C-alpha cells in the first residue's frame, strides 16, 4: 500500500513538472512578432523561409534570428575586408577600412549579446543588439560620405532587418 501511494505521488509530481514546463514553452506568435518589426514583409518572408521557426517558442526564435544576425554580420565583414584588399582607389580603400572597423564593432557587440540571450535577459539582448546595429549603419553613412558605391554594403540592409526582428523578440522575452 505504501509503495502504491509513493508511486502515485511520484507520478503526480512528474506530471506536474512536465505540464509546468510545457506551459513555459509556448509557441511564439510569428504574426505578432512580424507585425511589430520595422520591415514587416522582410520578417514574414524570413520566418516563412526558415522551417525551424514554425512551432518554435520565443527563446528558440530568438536563438534562430540571433544566429542569422551573427552570420549576416560575419558575411558583411568578410565581403568588406576583401574589398579593402582589392581596392586601388585610396578614397575607396579608406571607406572600406572604416567599414571593417564598424563591422568588427558590430560583431563584438553581438558576441556580448550572446550572454544576455543565453540567460533570457531580453533587455540586455536588446541593448547589445541595438549597439551592434550601429556599426553597419555607420558604414553605410561612411560610404555615402566618401561617395563610394553603397551597393558594396548591400548586406547591411538584411543585417538591420534581422536585428530588428531580434529586437522585437527581445521586447517580448
Curated annotation (Swiss-Prot):
Keywords of this entry: Apoplast, Disulfide bond, Glycoprotein, Secreted, Signal
Region forming the signal peptide: 1-25
Compartment annotation: Secreted, Extracellular space, Apoplast
Principal subcellular localization: secreted
Expressing tissues: Highest expression in flowers. Expressed exclusively at the pollen tube tip.
Cellular component terms per the entry's GO annotation: apoplast; endomembrane system; pollen tube tip
SS bond partners: 34-43, 99-139
InterPro entries: Invertase/methylesterase_inhib, PCW_Enzyme_Inhibitor, Pectinesterase_inhib_dom, PMEI_plant
Biological processes per GO annotation: pollen tube growth
Misc: The polarized accumulation at the pollen tube apex depends at least in part on local endocytosis at the flanks of the tip.
Subunit field text: Interacts with PPME1.
Free-text function comment from the UniProt entry: Inhibits pectin methylesterase (PME) from flowers, siliques and pollen tube.
Protein name, per record: Pectinesterase inhibitor 2
Native organism: Arabidopsis thaliana (Mouse-ear cress)
Amino acid at each position: 500500500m505504501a509503495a502504491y501511494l509513493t508511486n502515485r505521488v511520484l507520478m503526480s509530481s512528474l506530471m506536474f513538472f512536465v505540464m509546468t514546463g510545457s506551459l513555459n514553452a509556448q509557441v511564439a506568435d510569428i504574426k505578432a512578432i512580424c507585425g511589430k518589426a520595422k520591415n514587416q514583409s522582410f520578417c514574414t518572408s524570413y520566418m516563412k523561409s526558415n522551417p525551424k521557426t514554425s512551432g518554435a517558442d520565443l527563446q528558440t526564435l530568438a536563438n534562430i534570428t540571433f544566429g542569422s544576425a551573427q552570420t549576416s554580420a560575419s558575411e558583411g565583414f568578410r565581403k568588406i575586408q576583401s574589398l579593402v584588399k582589392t581596392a586601388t582607389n585610396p578614397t575607396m580603400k579608406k571607406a572600406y577600412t572604416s567599414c571593417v572597423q564598424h563591422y568588427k564593432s558590430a560583431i563584438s557587440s553581438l558576441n556580448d549579446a550572446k550572454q544576455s540571450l543565453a540567460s533570457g535577459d531580453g533587455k540586455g539582448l536588446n541593448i547589445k543588439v541595438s549597439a551592434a546595429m550601429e556599426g553597419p549603419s555607420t558604414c553605410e553613412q561612411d560610404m555615402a560620405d566618401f561617395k563610394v558605391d553603397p551597393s558594396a554594403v548591400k548586406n547591411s540592409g538584411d543585417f538591420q532587418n534581422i536585428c530588428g526582428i531580434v529586437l522585437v523578440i527581445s521586447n517580448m522575452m
